[in-house]
UniProtKB/Swiss-Prot annotation:
One of its GO terms (cellular component) is mitochondrial large ribosomal subunit. It is found in: Mitochondrion. It comes from the Eukaryota. The keyword Lyase does not apply. It comes from Debaryomyces hansenii (strain ATCC 36239 / CBS 767 / BCRC 21394 / JCM 1990 / NBRC 0083 / IGC 2968). This is Large ribosomal subunit protein uL29m. It holds the Pfam family MRP-L47. Component of the mitochondrial large ribosomal subunit. Mature mitochondrial ribosomes consist of a small (37S) and a large (54S) subunit. The 37S subunit contains at least 33 different proteins and 1 molecule of RNA (15S). The 54S subunit contains at least 45 different proteins and 1 molecule of RNA (21S). Belongs to the universal ribosomal protein uL29 family. One of its GO terms (biological process) is mitochondrial translation.
Length: 302
């Protein structure tokens, strides 16, 4: 115990002497001071993958934090509802988030301008209004699809009656109404039969089924009946009805007049064979697959 106390006393004395020791400075004239570092953003390393770069129009390549009016796409217009109705869910989902990203960039720029009270943001606000309108229309297009799908599930028993009524209205529609009816037909064939609006949206293994074949027959004969009603002179030249999926498919992929010409060529060449049930799905998958590949090849050439 005695040795322990002596060590503590010695330790305390050392600290006391250290505190009371006179301070000595070297020659201050020999000390070299570095130049002060001017505060600048260049002194900081920011990762090029930092998420906040998403709030700038050109990402980590952006040279300014605020775009002037001339840098904005003020000549653009909102997407129309008919245009959005033709898009797949994946396209609408992607478009929604691209718009959301642009709106976030605009909101940051407006907030920055407000803090300085020196820059006009009228163009930014006008562009944001256009983007907001497009988002509202995307919601409307999705709601229409959901409602159409739910209605199909609830009144399956009335499908035949509804399709019959639509067929009569479509065939007898005026030329001024046919554009609207064609848009309705696109929604109808998707809601009732799962026929996608765009070729590239097809999953050939899953989408080609009995419902698809039924829808193909309905759409093809519907377009043919309207064409013949509008062109009575063609009734004698073109024999009806259509002879299975081989003759029906052109009406889904092409304009009615082009489809009729193609069917006539098939008939003249003897290629308009009637397929057995087991051959229908493979034929459709193969034909649609070739059409999709041709469309991709054409886009690459452009």
């Amino acid at each position: 115990m005695a040795s322990h106390l002596s060590i503590r006393s010695l330790s305390g004395s050392s600290r006391y002497l250290a505190r009371n020791k006179a301070l000595k400075f070297t020659d201050l004239k020999s000390i070299k001071l570095r130049e002060p570092i001017v505060p600048t953003h260049k002194n900081f390393d920011v990762s090029p993958d930092h998420p906040l770069w998403a709030f700038f129009p050109d990402g980590n390549k952006s040279e300014t934090c605020f775009r002037e009016t001339v840098d904005l796409d003020i000549q653009s217009r909102p997407w129309g509802l008919p245009e959005l109705r033709r898009k797949s869910f994946e396209d609408l989902h992607k478009l929604w988030y691209l718009i959301l990203k642009e709106r976030n960039i605009l909101a940051r720029e407006v907030r920055l301008a407000d803090s300085f009270n020196e820059r006009s943001t009228h163009a930014h606000n006008d562009l944001d209004d256009k983007l907001t309108l497009t988002q509202k229309r995307i919601k409307q297009a999705l709601i229409e699809r959901q409602v159409a799908y739910e209605r199909v599930q609830t009144f399956t028993d009335n499908q035949k009656e509804y399709l019959s009524d639509f067929e009569e209205s479509y065939i007898n529609a005026d030329s001024s109404e046919i554009v609207s009816f064609n848009e309705k037909l696109v929604r109808l064939q998707y809601a009732f039969f799962g026929i996608q609006p765009q070729l590239e949206d097809y999953n050939l293994e899953e989408d080609i089924n009995v419902k698809f074949v039924e829808g193909l027959s309905y759409v093809a004969n519907l377009k043919l009946k309207r064409y013949l009603s509008q062109n009575p002179q063609s009734t004698e030249e073109f024999q009806t009805p259509l002879n299975g999926v081989v003759e029906e498919l052109p009406f889904l992929l092409r304009d009615t007049e082009e489809a009729i010409e193609e069917v006539q060529e098939l008939r003249n060449s003897g290629a308009n064979v009637v397929l057995h049930k087991i051959e229908v799905f493979p034929f459709l998958r193969n034909a649609l697959g070739k059409t999709i590949q041709e469309a991709y090849a054409s886009d690459e050439q452009l």
